[in-house]
Amino acid sequence: MEKLGIIDKKKTVFVLIDIQDKFIPAIKDIDKLISNSNILVKASEILNIPLIVTEQYPKGLGHTYEKIDLPDKKYLIEKVSFSCFGSKEFIKKIKELKVNSIVLFGIEAHVCILKNALDALKNNLDVYVVADAISSRTAENKSIAIERMRQSGVFIVSTEMILFQLLDKAGTEEFKLISKLVK
């Protein structure tokens, strides 16, 4: 039976990938990516979903872009491989969190997002890539990356789609707070 993509917030981790200073000027639709990434970061706090933030070779590429409103409660992991799964620290954290779903957003769609999505699948995780919170230097690379991930079994979602899937129902305090975020 095919996977349905039903996600449980208690078994989910958000991973913000490589939204770093040196990448910012070259990335297509960067303002939308930053806006939606900030919504996801804030939602991770509201929904009590762990947030892992990665930085690709920060010594050369800078740290997480200052317009990303990172919470105090996050796990920051530096990496040199395109995939977080190349980091023992990342793998250890995923195992500690006991998650079965991973939500990916950040840059670049056709490099690090793609590699992480495929490696997460290989590690038996359900993978959700937030299409309106990823980008590349060209729209074509983003589009091809999304198609490639979809072919492999990744669930392609939007910011609002994943948040309301995680909420499950209206009328809660979480629902009210998330609704304010996406308006």
Where are the regions that the model predicts?
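Conserved residues at the C-terminal ends of beta-strands
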Residues: 17, 55, 105
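Active-site loop/turn elements of alpha/beta-hydrolase fold enzymes
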Residues: 19, 56, 132
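A positional/architectural concept
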Residues: 22-27, 31-53, 58-59, 63-69, ...
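Generic N-terminal amphipathic, Lys/Arg-enriched alpha-helix
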Residues: 10-26
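Active-site-adjacent betaalpha module
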Residues: 2-13, 59-183
